[in-house]
Each structure stands twice: as structure tokens, then as C-alpha cells.
């Protein structure tokens, strides 16, 4: 699969360093191989030059003319409904989860650790029961408990059949 995230007019990027860290910006113009002119009218980013080393390119791109003014960038941004698309993207969800994790206090971390321990205990029990029920070659093993239940069920059915015949 070829590379598809090019530095181009309309490409949406996420600032990774500096005062704009975490904000989305649109590339308006490429100044040189290291710098671009960015604008983020709906994310509170004024039009300014920004280093490419401090940007992460996203898969999103909005259509507007080369070196368009801020009002046209704003219009294209709102028409593309970029905010909603970004909120459901895995990248955004992961960033929000990292933010939530970093804001946990000591008691929240304890509750999380306790819940994980409980979940893992349930998973281990379920795995071990399945492991007991299978042989080394992968075929299901009939346990004594299963055999007893099956015999009881057959007796119950046999009793009904015998009663029906009489």
C-alpha cells in the first residue's frame, strides 16, 4: 500500500509539540521542506508558520484553494464535519484515554487494578475449565460430572417413556 499522507494544502495535522500541542490544524501553504503555514480556525489556532517536525499528518484532508484566507478554511472545515470524524477516530479515542489515565488519582488507580484483577480471575477460571474439557489433540473430553448429568437426563426421559407406554 503506497504512502497516502502527503504534505499538501488542505491536509489536517495534529500538532505534537509547542504551545499548540494536541490541536488540529490545516496546512494552508508549504513554505519550504521544513516549514508550513497552518491555520486552525475552529481549534483556536491562529494562522502561523509551523515546523513539520512538530506535526503529525492525519488521513483527513479538506478541499480549499491554495493559500486560502481563514474564512474559506473555516467554511471548508465546517462543511467537511471534521470535528465529528475526528472524535470517533481511533487516534482521538486513544488520546482521550491517555488523558483520562493520566488524570486518575491514587484511589482510582487502586479501583482499576482491583477490577482488572477480578476480570483476570474470571478469565483464568473460564480458560481452565475449557482446558480441562479438551484433550491434548483438541477433541472434547467427557468428564465424570458430564457423564452423571447425561445418565440422569436419560433416566428421566426413560421414566417418562415407560410411563407413556403403560
Swiss-Prot record:
Please list where the region (Disordered) is annotated.
135-166
- CDD domains linked: eL14
| Keywords, ordered alphabetically | Ribonucleoprotein, Ribosomal protein
Output the Pfam families linked to this UniProt entry. Answer: Ribosomal_L14e
Which BP terms does GO give this entry? cytoplasmic translation; negative regulation of neuron apoptotic process; ribosomal large subunit biogenesis
Biased-composition ranges for Basic and acidic residues? Answer: 146-157
- One Gene Ontology cellular component annotation? cytosolic ribosome
Report a single Gene Ontology molecular function: structural constituent of ribosome
Q: Which family does it belong to?
A: Belongs to the eukaryotic ribosomal protein eL14 family.
Q: Which PANTHER family match?
A: 60S RIBOSOMAL PROTEIN L14, LARGE RIBOSOMAL SUBUNIT PROTEIN EL14
Name this polypeptide is given:
Large ribosomal subunit protein eL14
| Source organism (scientific name) | Drosophila melanogaster (Fruit fly)
Lineage of the species this protein comes from? Eukaryota, Metazoa, Ecdysozoa, Arthropoda, Hexapoda
Q: Per UniProt, what is the name of the gene that codes for the protein in this document?
A: RpL14
Amino acid at each position: 500500500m503506497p504512502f497516502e499522507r502527503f504534505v499538501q494544502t488542505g491536509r489536517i495535522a495534529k500538532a505534537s509539540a509547542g504551545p499548540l500541542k494536541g490541536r488540529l490544524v490545516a496546512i494552508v501553504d508549504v513554505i519550504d521542506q521544513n516549514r508550513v503555514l497552518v491555520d486552525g480556525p475552529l481549534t483556536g489556532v491562529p494562522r502561523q508558520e509551523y515546523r513539520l517536525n512538530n506535526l503529525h499528518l492525519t488521513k483527513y484532508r479538506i478541499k480549499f484553494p491554495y493559500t486560502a484566507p481563514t474564512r474559506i478554511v473555516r467554511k471548508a472545515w465546517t462543511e467537511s464535519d471534521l470535528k465529528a470524524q475526528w472524535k470517533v477516530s481511533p487516534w482521538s479515542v486513544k488520546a482521550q484515554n491517555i488523558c483520562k489515565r493520566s488524570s486518575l488519582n491514587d484511589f482510582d488507580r487502586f479501583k482499576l487494578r482491583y477490577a482488572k484483577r477480578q476480570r483476570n480471575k474470571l478469565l483464568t477460571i473460564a480458560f481452565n475449565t475449557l482446558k480441562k474439557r479438551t484433550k491434548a489433540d483438541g477433541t472434547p473430553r467427557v468428564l465424570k460430572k458430564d457423564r452423571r448429568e447425561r445418565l440422569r437426563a436419560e433416566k428421566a426421559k426413560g421414566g417418562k417413556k415407560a410411563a407413556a407406554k403403560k
